[in-house]
């Protein structure tokens, strides 16, 4: 019978041999320009493949009570502007849903929407935006409004040109889509969301995927460990999309609508930038929507736990990846507006290629 020490030594030798063999094979694949990350990722996913549960709402364990502290921690993850926010509103006649910045003078005689003279909120001299409060966030999370008019949206681009998170939006924002809560018309969008999730994983990013309130769209959230210049964050986002176009074989990426923040900076003091509706909307969550989902499209049972487990990216990580992924067209497109910038899957047809910093005050 072998000595235990001898057994351990033999096992260690076998492990070393396997690691060496593994590295040699990886080098051969790298030299041949063959990627093994996609196959490895798919294998790992298949290992944990779980059937889709049709009862998505029942999977979720809802807290018996949502406290002000929970609301504060929630906003700490989705930290947008605090001096202005938006709420969902449904037109009683048309049934269309839209999000409006909240104003102290809304629908008073000083409100141009009531007067209907065509003046936008940002050009209104009487605008007096409301600041977001813990009560607003609690109402959003509790979801007691029958028509979801308690759902809030935030503006990710802060007034100083920084942001604390980024989002890839796979909702339908075509004209008329507001009638169905911005739902996509078919299920092909799911393939693109999975591709974007895989792109993140392949490049060392652990994203949080949310199924939208319609159940027919998604948001992919990436959190940052401190306020970072939106211009840098957007350069990182564009570089990630370009890198993904090299790694993932997709015929198109037509359901990807936009990346937020959608601007590098605000054009003036009256500008707000694009808004994004926050997840964990109490009413939609009952049906398993506005919920965080795994790679099998099943809602996580403990939504709060998965949210707070997600890592935050540092500025150093973003800068390193931008440098690593840089290519000749970066200088051309770095400052492009989202609507003007050609999507990478289209462009590929033409080219070869710890702790949060800051103080949060919500009253």
Q: Model regions: which residues?
A:
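DNA replication initiation modules
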Residues: 151-190, 194, 225-352, 356
């Amino acid at each position: 019978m072998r000595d235990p020490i001898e057994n351990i030594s033999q096992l260690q030798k076998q492990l070393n041999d396997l690691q060496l063999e593994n590295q040699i094979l990886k080098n051969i694949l790298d030299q041949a320009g063959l990627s093994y990350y996609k196959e490895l990722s798919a294998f790992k996913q298949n290992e944990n493949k779980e059937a889709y549960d049709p009862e998505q709402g029942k999977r979720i364990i809802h807290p018996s009570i949502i406290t002000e502290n929970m609301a504060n921690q929630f906003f700490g993850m989705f930290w947008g502007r605090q001096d202005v926010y938006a709420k969902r509103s449904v037109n009683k006649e048309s049934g269309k849903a839209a999000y409006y910045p909240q104003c102290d003078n809304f629908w008073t005689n000083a409100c141009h929407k009531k007067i209907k003279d065509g003046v936008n909120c940002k050009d209104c001299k009487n605008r007096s935006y409301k600041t977001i409060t813990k009560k607003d966030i609690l109402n959003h999370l509790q979801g007691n409004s029958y028509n979801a008019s308690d759902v809030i949206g935030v503006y990710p681009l802060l007034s100083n040109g920084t942001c604390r998170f980024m989002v890839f939006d796979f909702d339908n924002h075509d004209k008329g889509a507001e009638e169905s809560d911005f739902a996509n018309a078919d299920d092909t969008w799911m393939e693109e969301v999975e591709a974007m999730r895989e792109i993140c994983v392949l490049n060392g990013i652990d994203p949080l995927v949310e199924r939208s309130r319609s159940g027919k769209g998604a948001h992919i959230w990436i959190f940052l460990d401190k306020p970072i210049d939106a211009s840098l964050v957007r350069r990182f986002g564009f570089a990630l999309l370009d890198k993904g176009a090299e790694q993932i074989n997709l015929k198109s990426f037509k359901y990807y609508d936009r990346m937020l923040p959608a601007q590098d900076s605000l054009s003036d003091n009256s500008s707000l930038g694009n808004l994004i509706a926050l997840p964990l909307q109490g009413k939609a969550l009952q049906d398993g929507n506005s919920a965080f989902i795994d790679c099998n499209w099943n809602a996580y049972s403990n939504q709060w736990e998965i949210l707070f487990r997600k890592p935050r990216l540092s500025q150093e990580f973003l800068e390193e990846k931008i440098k690593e992924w840089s290519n000749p067209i970066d200088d051309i497109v770095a400052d492009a507006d989202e609507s003007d910038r050609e999507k990478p899957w289209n462009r590929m047809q033409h080219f070869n290629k710890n702790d949060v910093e800051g103080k949060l005050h919500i009253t």
